[in-house]
Every structure is written in C-alpha cells, then in structure tokens.
From Swiss-Prot:
Residues of the active site: 70
Native organism taxonomy: Bacteria, Pseudomonadati, Pseudomonadota, Gammaproteobacteria, Pseudomonadales
Record-stated family: Belongs to the thioester dehydratase family. FabA subfamily.
Gene Ontology annotations of biological process type: unsaturated fatty acid biosynthetic process
Entry keyword set: Cytoplasm, Fatty acid biosynthesis, Fatty acid metabolism, Isomerase, Lipid biosynthesis, Lipid metabolism, Lyase
Primary localization: cytoplasm
Protein name, as recorded: 3-hydroxydecanoyl-[acyl-carrier-protein] dehydratase
GO annotation, cellular component aspect: cytoplasm
Enzyme Commission (EC) number: 4.2.1.59, 5.3.3.14
Assembly information from the UniProt record: Homodimer.
Pathway: Lipid metabolism; fatty acid biosynthesis
Function statement: Necessary for the introduction of cis unsaturation into fatty acids. Catalyzes the dehydration of (3R)-3-hydroxydecanoyl-ACP to E-(2)-decenoyl-ACP and then its isomerization to Z-(3)-decenoyl-ACP. Can catalyze the dehydratase reaction for beta-hydroxyacyl-ACPs with saturated chain lengths up to 16:0, being most active on intermediate chain length.
Alphabetized CDD domains for the sequence: FabA
Species whose genome carries this gene: Pseudomonas fluorescens (strain Pf0-1)
Compartment list: Cytoplasm
Amino acid sequence: MTKQNAFTREDLLRCSRGELFGPGNAQLPAPNMLMVDRITLISEEGGKYGKGELVAELDINPDLWFFACHFEGDPVMPGCLGLDAMWQLVGFFLGWQGLPGRGRALGSGEVKFFGQVLPTAKKVTYNIHIKRVLKGKLNLAIADGSVTVDGREIYTAEGLRVGVFTSTDNF
C-alpha cells in the first residue's frame, strides 16, 4: 500500500484530534499552536541525507494571533514558533512511519535566526531533512530544517530531535 505523501489542513486538524495515526499516537497541536497549513511533500527517501524529507507551508495573514501581541507596534512572528513547527513536522514524520507513542521534542543542535516573518508576508515554507530514525525501545528522529518566507531562507536548525513515547509518565 502506498503511503499518503501530502496532507491538507483538514488532515492536519484530524491529526491534532488524534484521528490520523490512532489513539495514543503522534498528534499535532491544535490551533493556535498548529503552525502548519499543509504538508506538500513527505517521503521516506530524498532530502539532503536520502533518509526522508518533508515540505510544509503556513499561509501568513495580518490577523494571525501572534502579530497582535509580539510586539505591539512592531509585529513579528516569534522565532520559537518556526522552531516549534519544525519539531511538529519531525514528530509527524514518526507518526506517519507508523511508530507508536506520543511525540515530544527533545532538543536541537544549533539554531540560527537571520530574518523575520512580518504580517506583510504571504507564505512560510518549512523544509525538513531527516538524518536518522532510531527504532526500538526509543523511537527517535533526528533532522535538520530550514524556514523560508516568500522564498527567502530566514532560520536554520541542525539536529532537531523528536521522540515518540508509549508512556510519558516518567518523562
């Protein structure tokens, strides 16, 4: 059976409700913390390392919640939301691969910010390159990612780490 290789906003909302990968498995956050409108490509091959990739998008409009509070009179999307979106996508990749458990961001290596998302922007694109997936007692993905706004790269992150856990009692 061929896996679905693109996901709509409605698919992602189903994932946030726990309906895409099954109860107790990887979920995306619900709006307003869901930082992705669509996944245009997800693959177990390809990417910079040949081990998988995701491309996803967020449509920008001036009414998005964070522009009203970050910062008053100087609206900009918080960089941490772009970083969180990359973690969201790495976790989604694990669920899409059928690995059981709830996703948790476990850290990252170097993160660089060298641009910003303003209310005048049209589209943010996330590119995730899977470096490694560990399967076993701990299911973990390690990836590098980048964020572009209207075609210009503005953030990069190396060593994004996300695990899925069948129990988070001791986490």
